[in-house]
Amino acid sequence: SAAQTGMTPLLLAIGSAHFETASVLLDLGANPNAAPLGWAPIHQITWIRKAGQAGSNNPAPQGSGKIGSLEFTKKLVESGADINAKVTKRPPVGVSDLNMRGGTAFLLAARTADVDLMRLLVDLGADPHETNDDLSTPLMVAAGLGTGAPGEDPGTEEEVLEAVKYALSLGEDINAVDVLGNTAMHGAAYKHLPLVVAYLDEQGAEISIWNQENEIGHTPLLIAEGIHRGMNIVSSSVTEMAIKNILDRFPLPQ
C-alpha cells in the first residue's frame, strides 16, 4: 500500500505520469511539499520526464490524461510547492555517482539535460545556483558529473551541450570546484562527451583548475583513458583526444 511504502497518492500519481489525476489531487488539498521518502513531487518530475535511468534503460511511464508534465509543474508551483526544496535522501534514479542530497529540482533537471524543464523552473523562480551537499553545481551536473553508465544515462551529447550553455548563460562559474575536487570538465569526461570538453575549454575553463585529481584520484584525462566501472574498465578514445588536444596547447615546463 501507499502507506507501507511511504508514498503519498500524489507521488504515486506523478510516478505513473498521471498528471491529470495528480492535478485533481492538488485541487483536493494534497500537500505539494510532502516528501516522506526524502524527495518531493517537484523533484520527482525530473526523473519521470527523462527516464532512461542509468544502468536500466527502463522506458518512461506511459501516463494518462490531458495535462503534460510541464503544465503540471506550473500547477504544482502555483499550489505552493517549494521550487528550491532540497532532496534529503537518495531518490530512485538508477545507477549514479552523484550525491543527490541537497539537490534542487533545477539541479536534478540539469542531471538529465532537460533544458525545457530547467528553463521553466527558472521562469517560475528557481535559484539556478543552488548546489548539492558536495557543493557540486548545476553546471557540473549538466556536464555529466555523477554519470553512472556513459551512453546510457539520460541526456544526449547535444542535449548536454544545450544544458551546459544554458547554465553558463545564467552565470554559473565554469571554474567551480566541489568538495570532492570535481569540476565541470571532470563531469564531461565521466560522461564521455568530447564536444562538451571542447566547449568548456572555449568558454574559459582553466587548465590549472580542472587538470587536477579529484578525491578519488581521477583527472579528466585519466577518466577518459579508462577507469573501473563495476568489473570493467571503461574508456573513451574520442574524449581522451579532446582533452589531450587542450593539454598539448599548454605543455608542462621541462
Please give the residue ranges for each predicted region.
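Ankyrin repeat domain, specifically the short helix-to-loop turn at the C-terminus of the second helix
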Residues: 23-31, 74-82, 119-127, 162-173, ...
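Eukaryotic tandem repeat interaction scaffolds
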Residues: 131-147, 152-181
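Ankyrin repeat A-helix N-terminal signature
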Residues: 12-18, 44-69, 95-101, 108-114, ...
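Ankyrin repeat boundary/linker residues
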Residues: 2-3, 35-36, 87, 99, ...
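Start-of-repeat signature of ankyrin repeats
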Residues: 6, 38, 90, 102, ...
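Leucine-rich solenoid repeat scaffolds
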Residues: 210-253
